Amino acid sequence: MTAIDLGESARPGRAAPPSRRRMMCALLGLGLPAAWAADPQLPVATALADHLKVALQRKEPLLVMVSLAGCPFCKAVRESHLAPMQREQGLQVVQVDMMSGQPLRDFRGAVQTHTQQIESWAVRIAPTVLFFGRDAVELVPRLTGGYLPDFYGAYLDQRLETARKALA
């Protein structure tokens, strides 16, 4: 096997350990920052009543994802399921963040933080997806946790179909 010498001194017959700087340059060359920048995001909820109104005009439920920064299951749900559904089906999907002091106008018009809203819903696990219909009523049971990746999409599709039927 051939070792790659990145130009640093090494003992004969052994590759030099790459410096942090050289490793970063190598990663930059792979285009990883572009992949990180392409991380699909969901709109952050600002006014739930407004988001719900848009969804209902489209005859769709409002999907709210409760997320937590750094949560790998949240990232997987967002990137693999919710962002594509939003992009491809035009669903109204918004994100509310645990441990966030960002202001949010709730369904009644009262202003509180994302954290306060999550507490009022009694959500304790991220990710949790809620499906809202007319009068801000939850249409189906919440989809809580990451589940197994192979089955999450089926659970999400099933809940969405049931929520759509409840709106009809």
Model-assigned labels for residue ranges:
Residues T115-L130:
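Structural micro-motif
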Residues K75-E88:
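Typically the conserved alpha-helix immediately C-terminal to a functionally engaged Cys/Sec
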Residues F131-R164:
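Non-catalytic, surface beta->alpha helical segment in thiol-disulfide oxidoreductase systems
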Residues V44-P61:
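A short beta-strand-turn-helix
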Residues K59-A69:
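Short active-site neighborhood of thiol/selenol oxidoreductases, capturing the structured segment around
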Residues A35-A37:
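Boundary at the C-terminal end of the N-terminal hydrophobic targeting segment
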Residues G90-V111:
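Thiol-based oxidoreductase modules, predominantly thioredoxin-like and allied folds used
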